[in-house]
Each structure stands twice: as structure tokens, then as C-alpha cells.
Amino acid sequence: MAVSTFSSPTPVFGIAEPPASFSSTAIGWKQPLRFRRTKKPRVISCDYSCIEVRDVCYRPPGTQLNILNGVNFSLREKSFGLIFGKSGSGKTTLLQLLAGLNKPTSGSICIQGYGDDGQPKADPDLLPTEKVGIVFQFPERFFVADNVLDEITFGWPRQKGSLQLKEQLTSNLQRAFNWVGLDSIPLDKDPQLLSGGYKRRLALAIQLVQTPDLLILDEPLAGLDWKARADVAKLLKHLKKELTLLVVSHDLRELAALVDQSWRMETGGVLVAERPPL
């Protein structure tokens, strides 16, 4: 069998092209080899979903005055939304509606899917409240257990036959602790003895165990010293890559770099798209 000699082939798309002197018949091929330059087809998927609030109004039972009036906004998945405005304007009320703690008087809160052409793919689905996590301002006021483990597993299923769910929650717990930096905290420690920053981390971990589609935070930096504020802001930057965040805050400077969309709540419960004033 003859041996062909290659002369310094030049790679094209990772494949060396043989020189013109190369004969495929020398190694037993019946047809000459043909080398074609081919490009991998580009597959672009732009499908995405948004959490959409559509013309939502809210009037507390037994009253005649709306706290929220015709609120509309759309928040794309895995993005960071910020709502700011004066105290008493209705920001926290809106968060409570999103979390399912109250129901809108009118309007809807839904998840809308979109195709790569930017058009709605189908009718929207109502936002399931079990897929929404909320961390209130000063969350330590809502702690109920005397150790970290009992606090984070409070509300887990206790009945027989729930082993598979418990195993999934345990796996989620390990991931949540890693995400928020609690893996070095003793599980038998009283959560009320944690620093302010670590109390916020614990409150975040409790919600993350449930793998929410939307995580809502009400004043996440309030009452923290400068170092804890910086740590929580850094944590939110990481979480933004994993899930959708909606934050109500007066601390605009620390959060401005994270914001993808922002709105100002005006007195009277009207929401207006606006960049945070710095």
C-alpha cells in the first residue's frame, strides 16, 4: 500500500485539509474524498416569560377608597425589578397581592409566555402563589423556632408518605445554604442571636428552599450596617442569575447597579415606569 505524504495542512474549522497531491485511492477508497467547509447551524432561542400585573386595583374590604389604582407592569424572568416611592403609597400592598396574601379587587396577576418573535405564545396562566416567595422587612420578627434547623424546616410535611418530598426539600436546603452563605452556621444556633445580615440570609434561604419563580423582598437593606448592606446586595446580584427578583426599597444607591426595570409608586396607588433617582 502506498503511503501518502501530507504537506503542512492548514486547519479549517478544526479539520486539516489534505493537499492536492493526496489520493484517496491510495488507501483503498473507491471514490475521491471531498472536504467541504461547513458551519454549524446557529440555534437561537428567545422564548421567555414575564410576570405581568394587568390593571390591578385593590380596595380593602369595608372601605370605599382604592389603595392601588390600575397598576400595570411586566417583569421578565431572571431579572431584577425595583419599586420605590413614598411611604404609604401602596408598595407593600402590591407585594402582598403578588404573594397571594390578599386578592386584587380587579385586574389579574399572571405569567405570560412569549415566542422568539416577541408575540404571546398562548393565553397567560395565573401566577401560582405557591411559586412566590416573600421576605418582609425585618423578617426576624416572624421567626418562630429557637434554632436554625427548626426555623428553616418549619412547615415541612410531617405526615407519612412524604419521604420523597422531604428528600427534595433537603437537597434544596443544601443548595439554598450554599447560595446565601449559611453553610458555616451551626444548625442548633438560636436565629435571634444571628447578626442582622445573617438573619436576612436565613430569611432568604427559607424562601429559596421552595424554589420560587418570583422572590419578593420588602426593604432588604433596612436596619443593616454598611458591611451587611454590601453583603446582602452582593447576594442579590448572585440570586438575580437564578430567579426573578422584585424589590421594594428606599435604598436606591446600593441597588441601582442591579436594576433591570424600575417603577415609582405615586400617592394614590399609581405605578409609573421611572429610573431610580440617584
From Swiss-Prot:
Residues 1-49 form a transit peptide. The keyword Oxidoreductase does not apply. GO terms for molecular function: ATP binding; ATP hydrolysis activity. Belongs to the ABC transporter superfamily. ABCI family. Keywords: ATP-binding, Chloroplast, Nucleotide-binding, Plastid, Transit peptide, Transport. ATP binds at residues 85-92. It comes from Arabidopsis thaliana. This is ABC transporter I family member 11, chloroplastic. The gene is ABCI11. Residues 51-278 form the ABC transporter domain. CDD domains: ABC_cobalt_CbiO_domain1. InterPro entries: AAA+_ATPase, ABC_transporter-like_ATP-bd, ABC_transpr_CbiO/EcfA_su, ECF_ABC_transporter_ATP-bd, P-loop_NTPase. GO terms for biological process: chloroplast organization; transmembrane transport. One of its GO terms (cellular component) is chloroplast envelope. SMART domains: AAA (SM00382). Its main location: plastid. It is found in: Plastid, Chloroplast.
